[in-house]
């Protein structure tokens, strides 16, 4: 057990982006992950392709995950946020090459309507989606991402009006 923990800590973080996508009512897009039996809700996120800027990656990932890029960036996080995945998930994610993700987060105003959202994309990540209030967001998020989400909410909260 010690060796696997040590190995876990030696792994790097995967660079990525996260998107807090707001609708006109300032509710936040959350999707339920398709690859797990537990109720694992999260905001859209994804990796950064080499040579891609974080803002370009955020808009690309938005299109890939929710089927729409109708929106614009309101703000970018001031720092990189990171999280570790539980050690039992490491072999199942990213070929076991990363301990978690370090992410630049973006607050995005969605300018489309619900009909523009299509989670049945070529590589779907969600099997359900909904708009969540800021108050309920932290209670429905998968626990190992909660601390990161608290930090993102704290940074963007004053901009959500």
Curated annotation (Swiss-Prot):
Nudix hydrolase domain segment(s): 12-154
GO CC annotations on file: cytoplasm
Source organism, top-level taxon: Bacteria
Keyword vocabulary terms for this entry: Hydrolase
Sequence motif Nudix box, location on chain: 46-67
Enzyme class: hydrolase
Essential cofactor(s): a divalent metal cation
GO process terms (BP): mRNA catabolic process
UniProt GO molecular function: mRNA 5'-diphosphatase activity
Protein EC: 3.6.1.-
InterPro entries: NUDIX_hydrolase-like_dom_sf, NUDIX_hydrolase_CS, NUDIX_hydrolase_dom, RppH
Matching PANTHER family: M7GPPPN-MRNA HYDROLASE (PTHR23114:SF17)
Functional description taken from the UniProt entry: Accelerates the degradation of transcripts by removing pyrophosphate from the 5'-end of triphosphorylated RNA, leading to a more labile monophosphorylated state that can stimulate subsequent ribonuclease cleavage.
NCBIfam families per record: PRK00714.1-3, PRK00714.1-5
Similarity section: Belongs to the Nudix hydrolase family. RppH subfamily.
Name the UniProt record assigns to this protein: RNA pyrophosphohydrolase
């Amino acid at each position: 057990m010690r060796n696997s923990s040590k190995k876990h800590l030696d792994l790097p973080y995967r660079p990525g982006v996260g998107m807090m996508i707001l609708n006109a009512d300032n509710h936040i897009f959350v999707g339920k992950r398709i690859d797990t039996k537990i109720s694992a809700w999260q905001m859209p996120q994804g990796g950064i392709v080499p040579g891609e800027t974080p803002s370009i990656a955020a808009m690309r990932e938005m299109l890939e995950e929710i089927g729409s890029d109708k929106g614009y960036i309101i703000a970018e996080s001031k720092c990189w946020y990171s999280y570790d995945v539980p050690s039992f998930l490491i072999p199942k994610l990213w070929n076991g090459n990363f301990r978690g993700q370090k992410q630049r987060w973006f607050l995005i105003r969605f300018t489309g309507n619900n009909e523009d959202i299509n989670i049945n994309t070529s590589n779907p990540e969600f099997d359900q989606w909904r708009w969540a209030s800021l108050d309920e967001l932290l209670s429905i998020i998968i626990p190992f991402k909660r601390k990161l989400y608290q930090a993102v909410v704290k940074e963007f909260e004053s901009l959500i009006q």
